[in-house]
Amino acid sequence: MLRHILGLAKKHPSLIPLFVFLGTGATGATLYLLRLALFSPDVCWDRNNPEPWNKLGPNDQYKFYSVNVDYDKLKKERPDF
């Protein structure tokens, strides 16, 4: 498969940007799914802990991007379980 793509790139050099953008998009999508699977509190890989979101504190950042929130200055406003 890779030889076929390289052969096409040698025959038609105008396809090289297409292959680069497709590869970049596929790599980005894979890395984003890996980030969601490993660092999201909504995903639980441990069956012994059915509620993993209770371990998160108010100053744990798990959003991908937050604009104006300083997580170090947030106070705890929920009870301990």
From Swiss-Prot:
It is a single-pass membrane protein. Residues 1-14 are mitochondrial matrix. The chain crosses the membrane at residues 15-37. Keywords: Acetylation, Electron transport, Membrane, Mitochondrion, Mitochondrion inner membrane, Phosphoprotein, Respiratory chain, Transmembrane, Transmembrane helix, Transport. Disulfide bonds: none annotated. Pfam families: B12D (PF06522). The modification Phosphoserine is found at S66. The modification N6-acetyllysine is found at K10. GO terms for molecular function: protein-containing complex binding. One of its GO terms (cellular component) is mitochondrial inner membrane. It is found in: Mitochondrion inner membrane. InterPro entries: B12D. Residues 38-81 are mitochondrial intermembrane. Its main location: mitochondrion. It comes from the Eukaryota. Component of the cytochrome c oxidase, the last enzyme in the mitochondrial electron transport chain which drives oxidative phosphorylation. The respiratory chain contains 3 multisubunit complexes succinate dehydrogenase (complex II, CII), ubiquinol-cytochrome c oxidoreductase (cytochrome b-c1 complex, complex III, CIII) and cytochrome c oxidase (complex IV, CIV), that cooperate to transfer electrons derived from NADH and succinate to molecular oxygen, creating an electrochemical gradient over the inner membrane that drives transmembrane transport and the ATP synthase. Component of the cytochrome c oxidase (complex IV, CIV), a multisubunit enzyme composed of 14 subunits. The complex is composed of a catalytic core of 3 subunits MT-CO1, MT-CO2 and MT-CO3, encoded in the mitochondrial DNA, and 11 supernumerary subunits COX4I, COX5A, COX5B, COX6A, COX6B, COX6C, COX7A, COX7B, COX7C, COX8 and NDUFA4, which are encoded in the nuclear genome. PANTHER family: CYTOCHROME C OXIDASE SUBUNIT NDUFA4 (PTHR14256:SF4), NADH-UBIQUINONE OXIDOREDUCTASE MLRQ SUBUNIT (PTHR14256). Belongs to the complex IV NDUFA4 subunit family. This is Cytochrome c oxidase subunit NDUFA4. It comes from Macaca mulatta.
